[in-house]
Amino acid sequence: MIRKYLRWLYAPIMKMIRNRKSHDRILNDTLRLDELGRQLSESQHRVFYLGITQHSNLGDMGQHYCIKKWISKNYPASELIMFEVTTVIDRRFDFFKKLKAIFRPQDVIVFQSGYTTTDLGGYHDEMHRMVIENMPDAHILMMPQTIFFRKEKNRERTAKSYDMAQHMLFLARDMVSFEAAKRMFPHVTVKVFPDIVTTLIGSFDFN
């Protein structure tokens, strides 16, 4: 009851608290790059998994689980380093300056799969563009994507950015997205690959 009548005061205070928590989380996450630079061996191969899921959506959690499993299988000796999308795109703490300081030519960037090459919401497409524009020579694996843009200007912006990538493999999880990707960024290697969650088919026995 008190909250109802003091909502005008309560709401901005709670927003301020949430913003502060977000600020501290992103700052601490970014500062991990400095610590990693001191800890990681120069001979250690690294996989940077960017855009990991931040919420409890079951589909996104399934993608995350399968991607980690795939990385573990295909890069068993590599150091896996993960960051959320909000950390990557935050411009306040020099994320890319810190990342480029420890990133080496043999390292790999892996992007979260799903419905993330789109202008329907979220920050993943912005993250993809920022990474490619800051690190066009990096080896990048774009896990299976669906492509859809409502606005032509957004599609063109993404197409121009993605086509800058010198060493990116873009996996499309449907034929419509595959054809769209080939048109949008003709200099990028594009392949068809089913949703990464399908790799779980046959993995469990429910009898």
Regions found by a protein language model. Give the residues of each.
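Phosphate- and divalent-cation-binding pockets in alpha/beta enzyme and binding domains
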Residues: 57, 66, 176-183
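Aromatic- and Gly/Pro-rich donor/ligand-binding loops
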Residues: 2-163, 193, 197-207
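Extended, charge-rich low-complexity interaction segments
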Residues: 105, 174-176
